[in-house]
Design a protein with these regions (language model features):
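S-adenosylmethionine/decaboxylated-SAM
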Residues: 25-27, 39-222
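Class I SAM-dependent methyltransferase Rossmann-like catalytic core
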Residues: 7-48
Length: 222
């Protein structure tokens, strides 16, 4: 695992002016992600310039909206549980209130009834059982922030590596690395880093992998 300072990533975002570096984000409240991790995700997206994005864990749709607003040409897929797929599901105890909130917000997700909704495809189901075969080798950016239990984390990670584009620059980003509610995540990603070059942004909850980006990886390690 490579632990890097935030500027290492932000310096990879090349722009002709500060105006081009501007982004729009939803100001956080108690339900939405902190701005720092959102800025990291948007920087990763600016680096790889995704045509397609897949999000594990829609939650209330704020991060989905952040991505849609800042990348107007990008198609976004977002997956989360519905009432049917929740039946009999074994979740991490800390995920249960998040799922309850997600289901409560079904008709109030952040991107609904906005100009960006038409570029967002909502998918429903348990990601451990979902058939991702139709999305293989099609996603340029994958954001893993769904079920945090070890089984789901491993399943989502393996499916992410199947979905990531093989012929283009791509990125897989994991959220909640360092979240005290999920102490097993650093250990899991640490073991994964034995076979994959992973980067953790210090002072954040984000770890990422870059695909077909040897030059960028070298800069991050320098």
């Amino acid at each position: 695992m490579h632990n890097i300072r935030p500027h290492k990533l932000f310096n990879l975002v090349h722009s002709a002016s500060y105006l081009e570096r501007m982004v729009q984000v939803v100001l956080p409240d108690k339900e939405s992600p902190v701005v720092f991790d959102t800025a990291i995700l948007l920087a990763l997206a600016k680096v790889v310039r995704p045509r397609t994005i897949f999000e594990f864990g829609t939650y209330i749709g704020v991060q989905t909206l952040n991505l849609a607003v800042n990348f107007p040409e990008t198609k976004i897929y977002t997956l989360d549980l519905d009432e049917a797929s929740l039946q009999g599901l074994q979740q991490d105890p800390s995920d249960k209130p998040l799922t309850e909130r997600h289901l409560k917000y079904q008709t109030q997700l952040a991107f609904l009834n906005t100009p960006y909704e038409k570029r967002i495809t909502r998918l429903y189901g348990d990601s451990n059982k979902y058939d991702f075969s139709g999305l293989a080798n099609q996603m340029d950016l994958i954001y893993i922030d769904g079920g945090h239990d070890p089984v789901t984390l491993d399943s989502d990670t393996k499916n992410a590596f199947k979905m990531i584009s093989q012929g283009n620059a791509g990125c897989i980003a994991w959220h909640d690395h360092g979240n005290p509610l999920y102490p097993h995540i650093p250990e899991y990603l640490g073991k994964l880093s034995d076979s994959r070059q992973l980067f953790h942004i210090e002072e954040s909850w984000t770890t990422f992998f870059l695909q077909n980006s040897e030059g960028l990886v070298a800069l991050l390690k320098s």
